[in-house]
């Protein structure tokens, strides 16, 4: 019984710990003349970033429900290992590579960085 209680308490404690990763959330308004192929290339390139920058753990781009200002059609979420990794990503070769694809078709964006 003591072992079962210890296991339950350990599992509960592990679940209660807040994550230390950082979510970098980008809400994008594409330029009016951006083609579907260009948008797909930018989104696909975002998915390649974890292989180009080790501090990025995951990337999400599939919108299930999206409530935003008029013209904003895309959310891109990048999960970074830490705030330090997010800061290191800024101006990195990986970010510059992605910006070469993303920035020419981006009209504007709003970014939020969130952690616990």
Predicted regions and their residues:
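N-terminal targeting signals for Sec/Tat export/insertion, comprising classic cleavable signal peptides
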Residues: 24-57
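Short, well-ordered beta-strand segments in beta-rich or mixed alpha/beta enzyme
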Residues: 21-29, 61-90
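Glycine-rich beta-strand-turn "strand-cap" elements at beta-sheet edges
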Residues: 5, 17-20, 60-69, 99-116
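An amphipathic, aromatic/His-enriched active-site/gating alpha helix that lines ligand/cofactor pockets
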Residues: 51-56, 79-113
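Sec-dependent N-terminal signal peptides
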Residues: 3-13
């Amino acid at each position: 019984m003591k072992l079962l209680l210890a296991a339950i308490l350990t599992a509960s404690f592990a679940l209660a710990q807040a994550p230390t990763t950082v979510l970098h959330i980008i809400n994008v308004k594409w330029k009016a003349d951006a083609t579907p192929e260009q948008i797909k290339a930018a989104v696909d390139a975002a998915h390649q970033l974890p292989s180009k920058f080790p501090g990025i753990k995951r990337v999400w781009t599939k919108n299930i429900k999206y409530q935003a200002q008029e013209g904003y059609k895309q959310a891109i979420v990048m999960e970074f290992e830490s705030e330090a990794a997010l800061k290191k990503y800024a101006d990195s070769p990986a970010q510059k590579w992605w910006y070469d694809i993303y920035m020419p078709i981006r009209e504007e964006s709003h970014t939020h960085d969130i952690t616990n």
